[in-house]
């Protein structure tokens, strides 16, 4: 099996807004970050480490529960 380098994202955290992404917590703020899926596991996916601006980055705090499609 190949080795994939990426950011592990729980499937239940994934939302669809302007493409596929997740909400992340920035202090008190909630922000939407796109993900660039490079591998699909059972209950998670891996997002590219170097996808660029507007995409999930390694140290982002992913919100898994309690956020609806509008970020509330």
What residues fall within each predicted segment?
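Edge-of-domain interaction segments
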Residues: 1-72
């Amino acid at each position: 099996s190949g080795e994939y380098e990426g950011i592990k994202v729980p499937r239940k955290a994934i939302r669809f807004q302007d493409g596929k992404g997740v909400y992340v917590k920035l202090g008190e703020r909630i922000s939407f970050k796109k993900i660039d899926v490079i591998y699909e596991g059972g209950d998670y996916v891996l997002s590219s480490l170097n996808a660029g601006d507007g995409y999930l980055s390694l140290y982002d705090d992913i919100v898994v529960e309690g956020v609806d499609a509008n970020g509330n």
